[in-house]
Amino acid sequence: MDFRRIILWLVAIICFQATAFGQHKFVDRSTDVLCLAPAATGLVKALVEKDRKGVLQLTLSTATGIAVNYGLNACIKKNRPEMPNQPSWSDRHAFPSTHSMAAFDGATFLMRRYGWKWGVPAYAVSCYVAWGRVHANKHDWWDVLGGAAIGAGAALIYTRPFAKKVDLTISPAVFGEQGGGVHIAMQF
C-alpha cells in the first residue's frame, strides 16, 4: 500500500513539473507573438480608418523605440536572468526589454490615437507580455519597466488624438443697426 502511494506521489510530481514546464514554454512563446499585437492592431485600425497620419505616427514611434532600445542594449549589456554567466559581448542583453517596448508602444499609440476602448485591451496584453517575460526568466522587472517606459514615451512623443472630419463654417453676421458679429457653426 505504501509503495502505491509513493508511485502516485511521484507520478503527480512529475506531471506537475511537466505541466509547469509546458506552461513556462507557452508563456515564453506567447509573449513572442503578443508583443506585436498592439502595434499590429494599431496599424490595421489606422489603415481601415484611412488614417495616414496615424500610420506615420505609429511608424515614427516604433522606429524611435527600437533605436533607443537597441542603443541602450548595446551600451548597458546587462545579462539575462536565465544566463547570468553569459559573456559581456553576447547579443542576449536584457535591459531594456524589446518585447515590452514593442507592446507598450502599440498600446500607447492605440490609447492616445483612438481612445480608451482601444487602449485598455492593448494595455492588458502589454501587461501580460511584461509579466510573461519575467515569468519566463528572460528579464527582471527593471528590464520590462525600462522597455515599457521607452515604448510608451516614444508613442507619447509622436501620437496625437484622431479627429474625424468635421464641417466648420465661419461667416459674418449683420444684425441691422445693432451691430454685427461672427457666426460659427460646426457639424460633427
Task: Give the location of each predicted region.
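N-terminal signal-anchor/start-transfer transmembrane helix
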Residues: P38-K45
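Interfacial segments of alpha-helical transmembrane regions
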Residues: K45-G65
